[in-house]
Amino acid sequence: MGNHTWEGCHVDSRVDHLFPPSLYIFVIGVGLPTNCLALWAAYRQVQQRNELGVYLMNLSIADLLYICTLPLWVDYFLHHDNWIHGPGSCKLFGFIFYTNIYISIAFLCCISVDRYLAVAHPLRFARLRRVKTAVAVSSVVWATELGANSAPLFHDELFRDRYNHTFCFEKFPMEGWVAWMNLYRVFVGFLFPWALMLLSYRGILRAVRGSVSTERQEKAKIKRLALSLIAIVLVCFAPYHVLLLSRSAIYLGRPWDCGFEERVFSAYHSSLAFTSLNCVADPILYCLVNEGARSDVAKALHNLLRFLASDKPQEMANASLTLETPLTSKRNSTAKAMTGSWAATPPSQGDQVQLKMLPPAQ
């Protein structure tokens, strides 16, 4: 399928050709290593039969797929919204780019609901908080979002304007079927999950306030996690969906009115770029879940940097590089307290092995 030339709205792609690619480059530099680290930490949680790790692992996979598309979008914006990589790549990378928004929102919603069930109904809904259930829910999320956002794969998504710019996944004004699909995305893909997250947060607050056995620090940690999930969706995705809803509603009312499209063109591109910050915010969830997670991640990164800078990488490779996930930190600290009473003093060559009694860990 070739490019289609159309007499569309007069949008100046030169006004915002620096901000989106600059933000995307930042997301690549920060989001790629942190999501790789988050993926590894989530995998460790799955190994410990923790259902939360399944959702976090899927969230990291979605973010990494999204980050892999960003270099082409950097090139697209630096060329003033001119796609030079052909229609096939436009469809594939555009599909991944836009679908990731709703996959990320869905998994953030899953995490929020899972935390609500864990805090408010730990025994009643225990079966819903198993790894098998989380895998099934994740499969449904992927299948639903991929199917719901697959319509662009069956339409031409390259459009050449009067200035010989080839737009990918963009048309000003939009087409009718795109406007209706955008309404579905706004209400079902964005507002519905966000409403569930707000209800989950409200339920978590009620359960935490009514709990006598939960420590104050633990209550603060639970509230912080639930609030951070809502904040990520609000900050990263709300501006984009406000403009998306406005553009779609105005098009359905006045299909060939280009005035609004031309006024919000730059703001729309900026809001779309802001959605990429989700890939940076998601790994921060680990630090918000547990106070010790920040030091654990920093320690792992420090050891990794030492490994890369070391003259003896093999020695560093043999070193133990561990990272306590938020849900295992307490378990590991208890194990250390039990085993910390005894420690072996490393013997010199030819010496007898001596055992040294150490005081219990505090």
Curated annotation (Swiss-Prot):
Changing E145Q: Mimics the protonation state; induces a shift of the optimal pH for activation. GO terms for biological process: adenylate cyclase-activating G protein-coupled receptor signaling pathway; angiogenesis involved in wound healing; G protein-coupled receptor signaling pathway; glomerular mesangial cell development; negative regulation of angiogenesis; phospholipase C-activating G protein-coupled receptor signaling pathway; positive regulation of inflammatory response; positive regulation of Rho protein signal transduction. It comes from the Eukaryota. It is found in: Cell membrane. PROSITE patterns: G_PROTEIN_RECEP_F1_1 (PS00237), G_PROTEIN_RECEP_F1_2 (PS50262). Proton-sensing G-protein coupled receptor activated by extracellular pH, which is required to monitor pH changes and generate adaptive reactions. Activated by an optimal pH of 6.8-7.2. Ligand binding causes a conformation change that triggers signaling via guanine nucleotide-binding proteins (G proteins) and modulates the activity of downstream effectors, such as adenylate cyclase. GPR4 is mainly coupled to G(s) G proteins and mediates activation of adenylate cyclase activity. May also couple with G(q) and G(12)/G(13) G proteins. SUPFAM superfamilies: Family A G protein-coupled receptor-like. Residues 46-49, 122-129, 211-214, 290-362 are cytoplasmic. Changing R115A: Decreased proton-induced G-protein coupled receptor activity. Endothelial permeability is decreased under acid conditions. Belongs to the G-protein coupled receptor 1 family. It is a multi-pass membrane protein. This is G-prodeshotein coupled receptor 4. Changing D63N: Impaired ability to sense protons. Disulfide bonds join C9-C258, C90-C168. GO terms for cellular component: plasma membrane. One of its GO terms (molecular function) is G protein-coupled receptor activity. The chain crosses the membrane at residues 9-45, 50-80, 86-121, 130-156, 173-210, 215-250, 261-289. Glycans are attached at N3, N164. The record marks H155, H165, H269 as: Proton sensing.
